[in-house]
């Protein structure tokens, strides 16, 4: 039972993670451990798109070993239009052929990840449509068997913001997002025995988990951006699974077919995420920054009842309910120093702090319930050093680069193994 719960929970966690749709990040933001923003971070953000200063258009591209990013924004009188794409353009399909003395197998894999966002700005406010598509399909065909696994994940979201509530010392920027995610997983197999007139067995498993999410957030800004500026953020996210029941398994052996259905799967999670960020202009050439972010996540999962189609029991058995609580946090320290008026070095230190986790399992036993609670602190600590530069080639274009160095004995591998990222901005 616990194993089933963990499997269901892990599938749902994949879906939850995907609802926080990838936000474009500049090499400056990455190089300073998430502390210093620039135009590439702001042009598709409903809170800050108005801070991008250009008269005609703004263009941005970022290339790394794993993905490509393209961004473009333009003003049409009082309308602001921003577009953004990120995808794994160079990671496509692969195939492997294996031959043995009595069989031959061919395996093919097709996978890809793509993000596309569209932002409309008007009268200081903004609407942003975000989409995410991920596929990971694999097929293996051999002399006596076929397996076909298909995994797809789609996310659709709408974010509204841009307006602010100001006072003498405080500026409040509220914003909200609603989203819907679809996770489909199917596994088909066909197996034939290695004898004449053998029995053929086929199985078809499926899992469809849909997640509806609502996020309410606000930034509380104070200070002067020319000296000391700080932002306290607070966000609340509610996720719930809908439409996650139905036929999940079908097996055919010879002339006999078995179909299994599921009912009662439930999933709910609440996330509270406070954060704090500051920027300090220590001198004309030196800027210091820092941030800390905390996530408090409470998730309740019930795996539901399964039964053979046509044999649904009059009374469903009582279900086990798993509730997990996780508190995670990370911090970043950043610095930008101008060596020349048009060239600045970025340095950042990023750290993932120990996390607290607790699991409560309520299992029905006869007419009573058994409750088990386990909790503890994961004392593991990880950190990375980040560095890069910004080169303003002229008043219209700039080159932005960073690399990530894990603070482990194999840090050299992290530099040479694909962590280098190059960005290019142009505005006119």
Language model: regions and residue ranges:
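Detector for outer-membrane/organellar transmembrane beta-barrel domains
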Residues: 213-359
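N-terminal, post-signal peptide beta-strand-biased segments of exported outer-membrane/organellar beta-barrel
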Residues: 19-86
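Repeated loop/turn-to-beta-strand initiation elements of outer-membrane beta-barrel proteins
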Residues: 56-57, 77-82, 124-131, 166-176, ...
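Outer-membrane beta-barrel "beta-signal"
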Residues: 389-393, 397, 403, 414-428
